[in-house]
Amino acid sequence: MNRWRSNVWVCVELLLAFCLAWYMVDYFFVEIYNRSLPSGRGYANVWQVEMGLLPETSPDYRAAESDSIAMLGNYERIKDRLRDYPGVQAMGAASGCYSTPYTGCYYGIGLANAADTSKREAVMRYEIDPTTDFLSVFNHSYAKDGRPVSTSDFDWGDPRAIVTTRMVERKVFGEASAVGREVKDPFDEEGPTYIVKGVLEDIKRFDNSLPQGAAFLAIRPSAEEIPEMNYFIRIDPAVAGPRFADTFREKMSRELRVGNFYLKRLTSYERIKADTDYSFGITYDYRVRMALMAFLGLNILLCVMGTFWYRVRMRRGEIGLRMAIGSPREEIRSQMAREGICLLLMATPLALLIEAQFVMVGFLDIPKGTLPEHYWPAILPLRFLLVNILTWILLAIVILLAVWPPPARPPRWSRPRRCGMTDNR
């Protein structure tokens, strides 16, 4: 009877531990899966070059350099000098904060099939200078075969040119190719109609977010728009290092003193990404969740191990007797492990039933909107099955760890005393 009650309590404890561990494993499954998805672009060895404009009150300000012809000429000189810097593999320019990858700025537009505006998709908008190689700087690739992309691959001479991504093609045109097709913003009836010149891989806004659709439009900045342009360079790994920034500033501070422009700031994309993650709470949220999940996981581990250690300890007499009659320790350990696994198997069906209720009431975070193809976390039966398999394996390992050490220390048996007759004579 006592053994039966003990088994019931162990099953109840395993049931609770299974449900808690399932929630923990599910979170990490989705988080790790999202981070493992391709970003669609890269930031390695990329630097952002920010140019400042002298105010009219500055003693170095020259009014003649502020007219439109001088501004356009200075803009071209800035691009040429960045391209010609030793070790620069590619240079790109884009307009405004929203065209700067991995920042807090966002400019969203809608794209729809010009022939059927009911088929539409929301995308991130980027305005790039087609005379620079913005797409190569950030290692964009073709959706069809994954080849690296260069901005010069597309016909930007067409004022209606636009380059989109795989998600736009799939959502707006289905299985058909989007290249050569017309798209427009369904929310802007008077807006222009664009012609798709190419389809790239979808891109992530943040590392832990899902890939999104994007649209790249050409901008040929006017004199008024030039001060808002941002510049990006990708450098050769051979020249990358802790001294690159100091060397660049030392050499280019004079070279980039063009007209009323000056070198304002040079920032690595590693720093930009880290600052963005911190300002948006991504770093803090991830660390807090990791700490809470680690604490919860440690408690589950200690709870289950403690229960089985206590269970084995209460049977030390039985274990010692079996060892005394010749049972090897490996056989005893195997029996204890089998008992633990059997108890886990008994708790599993009820745990699955409870978890299914949580899923049905919407307890899980299920992604919405347009998702990548074959996105596992959105396939609930598959996600439910995989997470529970991982949870079961995790608890099985914990049980094996819990039952393994105790049989190595059987109780000491006291030597029996000899009985004899006492001579009272």
Label the predicted regions.
Residues 4-31, 281-317, 344-354, 394-401:
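Hydrophobic alpha-helical transmembrane segments of multi-pass inner-membrane transport and secretion
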Residues 25-117, 121-122, 369, 373, ...:
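Membrane-proximal extracellular/periplasmic loop immediately following the first transmembrane helix
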Residues 1, 302-341, 412-423:
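Intracellular coupling helices
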